[in-house]
Each structure stands twice: as C-alpha cells, then as structure tokens.
Amino acid sequence: MINPELRDGRADGFIHRIVPKLIQNWKIGLMCFLSIIITTVCIIMIATWSKHAKPVACSGDWLGVRDKCFYFSDDTRNWTASKIFCSLQKAELAQIDTQEDMEFLKRYAGTDMHWIGLSRKQGDSWKWTNGTTFNGWFEIIGNGSFAFLSADGVHSSRGFIDIKWICSKPKYFL
C-alpha cells in the first residue's frame, strides 16, 4: 500500500487544493494584463486619430467658417418654406453662436434680409430650430415671431413674407 503522506507530513490532497488556485490566479493575472494592453492600444489609437482629424470642406455653394458650413439662398421664401429647404439639405436655418459668425453672416449677406433659425410663440422665449433656447447674446428688434438678419442686425417679423434665408450645418470631421 502507498503511503498518502509526503515526506514533510502533508497529505497528498494539498497539491490538489493548491494547483486549481494557482491556475485561477494565473488566469486573473493574464486577464488584467490583457485589459491593460487593450486599453493602452485604444488610447493610443484615439490620440493618433484625433491628431489627424481634419474638417471636411463645405461642398458646392456652401461657405465654411470655423466649424460650420453656411448656405446663402438666392431665392426667396417664407420662414417655414426656408426651414424645410434647409432640412432637405440636412441643415437648419442658421444658428448664430458667436460674434465671429454674426460678423461673417452680416458681411456676406450684404443689404439683403435673410431668415435665420430663431422663432417664438407669442409670449414665449426665442428658440433655435434645433429646440435650444436662445441665450439673448444679441438683440432682436421687433415684435414678430420669426427672426431675420439684415445689415444692421437681427429683426423679427411675421413669417409669411418672402425673403432670402441662410442655412447652417456643422463641418464633419474624418
């Protein structure tokens, strides 16, 4: 008969208890190591991609300023029809977020009036066509419900008059 005790006095079952724990710890260690490697590779890839990201040029009749493309119509329509036109171009009536945008739009629009993407219901605050509330950083002159840009600033009117319009959409990065 074989003696189940080893020379140091421990039972043979000791090895059967320790080996599975060693294998389990080894697997956990390997998984942690692989997780660190995968995370590091992802961070490096994202950082490299971000450095090489370039804005796509605005196409056709669209003009690029900063991170936006603008379209100035030659045709005239009411505010709602202008909004629909912009939507069909995957754009919105122009949203003016900065003084730089405002100066560019006024300079390019010249003396013509152009619908922009601000409207309000009677007694409500002004909202952009994307649903965000206008923060009031420029004055809107008049008591109408639809905003338009002219050479001397932003005015409001009833939306049924036919004037030119400006669409805007973001430049997309690749």
Curated annotation (Swiss-Prot):
Pfam families: Lectin_C
UniProt topological domain (Cytoplasmic) ranges: 1-27
InterPro entries (UniProt xref): C-type_lectin-like, C-type_lectin-like/link_sf, C-type_lectin/matrix_domain, CTDL_fold, NKR-like_CTLD
Topological domain ranges for the Extracellular compartment: 49-174
GO aspect biological process, one term: natural killer cell mediated cytotoxicity
Entry keyword annotation includes Methyltransferase: no
Tissue specificity field: Mainly expressed in skin. Also expressed in keratinocytes, spleen, thymus, small intestine, peripheral blood monocytes, bone marrow, ovary, testis and skin. High expression in CD8(+), B-lymphocytes and naive CD4(+) T-cells. Restricted mostly to proliferating lymphocytes. Not detected in myeloid leukocytes or natural killer (NK) cells.
Membrane topology: Single-pass type II membrane protein
Listed result of changing residue 143 to A: Partial loss of glycosylation
Record-level Gene Ontology MF annotations: carbohydrate binding; identical protein binding; protein homodimerization activity
Keywords: Cell membrane, Disulfide bond, Glycoprotein, Lectin, Membrane, Receptor, Signal-anchor, Transmembrane, Transmembrane helix
GO cellular component: external side of plasma membrane; plasma membrane
Induction comment from the UniProt entry of this chain: By phytohemagglutinin (PHA) in peripheral CD8(+) T cells.
Disulfide linkage: 58-69, 86-167
Residues with attached carbohydrate: 78, 130, 143
Transmembrane segments: 28-48
Gene3D superfamilies on file: Mannose-Binding Protein A, subunit A
Modification(s) after translation: N-glycosylated.
Domain C-type lectin as annotated: residue spans: 65-174
Subunit structure of this chain's protein: Homodimer; non-disulfide-linked. Interacts with KLRB1. Interacts with KLRF2.
Function: Membrane-bound protein expressed mainly on keratinocytes which acts as a ligand to stimulate the activating receptor NKp65/KLRF2, expressed on the surface of natural killer (NK) cells. Facilitates thereby dedicated immune recognition of keratinocytes leading to natural killer cell mediated cytotoxicity. Also plays a role in modulating the extent of T-cell expansion.
Protein name in UniProt: C-type lectin domain family 2 member A
Gene (name only): CLEC2A
